């Protein structure tokens, strides 16, 4: 018996070429990298430690101008750059084909333009008008330290309140007399 099979069917199946296996497999797999024959268990590149596992892999680069994928298999970094420059000089590179930015909220497909997007003041991400409020999108960051502004607001409120009541509210601050009262009676 030369390659595999049984005495009755000598051409049926082949032995796995993994050194630790040698299983007679009736439906063998031929590796497209190293061209050896393997059983079901050893058919993947990783399972038989294929030395040419990246043989069939493909790489692409995305053009920043038009968002077209350009195959760059087998090129080094310098070659990829020249390939992209060649594409940009050709008539195929059209900036109108570039994918427009969309709202980052899940399942929202609204295209963000200059007129319909707002940046969240808490997380700094651009959203469409429908999802502009922190409650409408999953806002990742909490309110940035606004203790200084809230204390100033409280001071202004207390000053206005003291003007209204004509009392110092225990603060002992002098109130300017040229400010007009907040409520007028006629």
Curated annotation (Swiss-Prot):
One of its GO terms (biological process) is response to abscisic acid. InterPro entries: AN1-like_Znf, Znf_AN1. Zn(2+) 3 binds at residues 103, 108, 128, 131. PROSITE patterns: ZF_AN1 (PS51039). Gene3D superfamilies: AN1-like Zinc finger. Coiled coil: none annotated. It holds the Pfam family zf-AN1. A zinc finger (AN1-type) spans 10-58, 97-147. One of its GO terms (molecular function) is zinc ion binding. The keyword Zinc applies. Zn(2+) 4 binds at residues 120, 123, 137, 139. Residues 172-186 have a biased composition (Low complexity). Zn(2+) 2 binds at residues 31, 34, 48, 50. Residues 167-186 are annotated as: Disordered. Zn(2+) 1 binds at residues 16, 21, 39, 42. Signal peptide: none annotated. Keywords: Metal-binding, Repeat, Zinc, Zinc-finger. It comes from the Eukaryota. May be involved in environmental stress response. This is Zinc finger AN1 domain-containing stress-associated protein 12.
């Amino acid at each position: 018996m030369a390659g595999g099979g049984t005495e009755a069917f000598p051409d049926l199946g082949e032995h796995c070429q993994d050194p630790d296996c040698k299983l007679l497999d009736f439906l063998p797999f031929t590796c497209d990298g190293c061209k050896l024959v393997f059983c079901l268990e050893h058919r993947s590149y990783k399972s038989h430690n294929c030395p040419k596992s990246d043989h069939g892999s493909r790489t692409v680069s995305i053009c920043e101008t038009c968002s077209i994928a350009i195959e760059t298999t087998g090129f080094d970094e310098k070659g990829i750059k020249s390939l992209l420059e060649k594409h940009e000089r050709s008539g195929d590179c059209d900036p109108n084909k570039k994918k427009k930015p969309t709202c980052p909220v899940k399942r929202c497909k609204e295209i963000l333009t200059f007129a319909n997007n707002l940046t969240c003041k808490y997380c700094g991400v651009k959203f469409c008008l429908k999802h502009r409020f922190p409650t409408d999108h999953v806002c990742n960051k909490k309110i940035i330290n606004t203790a200084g502004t809230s204390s100033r607001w409280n001071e202004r409120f207390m000053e206005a309140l003291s003007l209204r009541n004509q009392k110092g509210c225990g603060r002992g601050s002098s109130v300017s007399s040229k400010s007009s009262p907040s409520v007028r009676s006629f």
